[in-house]
């Protein structure tokens, strides 16, 4: 520690400042989450960051704009050919760590975002060093964890450089886990690995206009976020059309389903597709045209191992939220959320849409304001950073002085 503050080295995938707005399809939720978390942690600890960037950005860091990002001490690139660049990146990271440690001393904690090949390789090397920092996984997404992996996929990935497909085995490399997904607890605590649920927080502060209690007309629905099959956007749109409620559904975002949604909007007057907005933060002002935002996430394809970060931005709009409980969303929204059932989802969606469409607009406005207040109090990044530092400090107090935690074995 330095002056009583933890020294933290964080391995991230966040962009440098001024870059992200030119690459809206890359790291949509992860970048603002990682940036805001590092900023909040730096107010409580001495934080250094490393950034791993995608090949699409190489050579395109300029010109910069005013989009958020992190000033990394080291930039790494995941480029083709993968075998060479991943091997080179992990060697760069190891050299950076050794030089930084020799110059400034060993960090207390290494935070590692997800289970990427380069960071995995570095973690496996670091575990063999003595002494070493506490190695903590920040698990935002784990698509294969708890899933049966087909033999063909195992065979295909066996030839991909530095890839560890079995995420369950990779968990054993870490001394603790900070997880976005509430369902990952069972992979850590039975093995004696400290685990903390931290579903993230809101990234864009927004003050919605005062509620218009004189507004009349049908209840309007909306969705913003990723547009792919995993997010269940198409079943949501189809369920809305089948419900035949008097209002309209508005959608904006980016993803593979954009063209499909555009075509649907052309055929149905009650469905409007607004495409990709200029900046993620623009979605909050866009949402003022609706009364209720819908989160249709289902516990499929490993999504229950993560958290839909758009829930926090939904909350900041001051609008009511209709959502499944998947990933612990109900623990964030509380009693003011309106909930869908994941079993028999299609029928539940139609019934809830009809019920919400019949609700008094003032009641929906009250719910939205209550959700916003709850998120501002309990799910801001400063509060999450405080919880993380408390979690890490508690582990370090029980850690052997030599810096090597007790061995962790598979259950």
Where are these regions (language model features)?
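Conserved donor-binding/catalytic core segment of Leloir-type glycosyltransferases
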Residues: 9-11, 178, 202, 212-231, ...
């Amino acid at each position: 520690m330095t002056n009583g503050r933890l020294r933290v080295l964080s391995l991230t995938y966040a962009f440098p400042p001024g870059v992200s707005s030119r690459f809206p399809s890359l790291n949509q939720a992860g970048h603002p989450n990682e940036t805001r978390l590092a900023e909040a942690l730096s107010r409580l600890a001495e934080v250094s960051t490393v950034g791993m960037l995608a090949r699409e950005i190489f050579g395109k860091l300029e010109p910069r704009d005013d989009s958020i990002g992190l000033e990394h001490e080291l930039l790494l690139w995941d480029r083709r050919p993968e075998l060479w660049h991943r091997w080179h990146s992990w060697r760069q990271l190891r050299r950076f760590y050794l030089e930084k440690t020799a110059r400034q001393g060993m960090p207390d904690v290494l935070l590692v975002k997800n289970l990427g090949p380069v960071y995995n390789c570095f973690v496996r090397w670091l575990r063999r060093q003595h002494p070493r920092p506490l190695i903590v996984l920040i698990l935002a997404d784990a698509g294969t964890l708890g899933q049966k992996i087909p033999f063909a996929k195992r065979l295909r990935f066996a030839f991909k450089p530095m890839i560890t497909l079995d995420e369950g085995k990779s968990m054993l490399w870490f001394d603790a886990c900070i997880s976005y997904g509430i369902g990952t607890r069972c992979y850590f605590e039975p093995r004696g690995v400290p685990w903390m649920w931290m579903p993230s927080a809101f990234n864009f502060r927004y003050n919605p206009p005062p509620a218009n209690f004189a507004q009349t007309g049908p209840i309007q629905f909306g969705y913003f976020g990723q547009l792919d099959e995993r997010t269940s956007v198409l079943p949501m749109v189809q369920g809305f059309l089948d419900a035949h409620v008097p209002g309209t559904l508005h959608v904006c975002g980016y993803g593979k389903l954009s063209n499909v949604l555009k075509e649907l909007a052309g055929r149905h007057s009650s469905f409007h597709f607004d495409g990709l907005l200029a900046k993620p933060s623009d979605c909050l002002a866009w949402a003022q045209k609706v009364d209720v935002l819908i989160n249709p996430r289902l516990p499929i394809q490993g999504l229950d191992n993560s958290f839909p970060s758009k829930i926090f931005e939904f909350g900041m709009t001051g609008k009511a939220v209709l959502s499944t409980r998947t990933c612990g969303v109900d623990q964030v929204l509380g009693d003011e959320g309106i909930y869908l059932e994941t079993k028999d989802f299609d029928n539940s969606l139609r019934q809830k849409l009809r019920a919400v469409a019949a609700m008094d607009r003032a009641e929906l406005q009250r719910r939205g304001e209550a959700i916003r207040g709850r998120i501002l109090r309990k799910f801001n990044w400063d509060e999450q950073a405080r919880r993380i530092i408390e979690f890490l400090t508690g582990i370090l107090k029980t850690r052997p002085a030599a810096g090597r935690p007790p061995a962790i074995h598979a259950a």
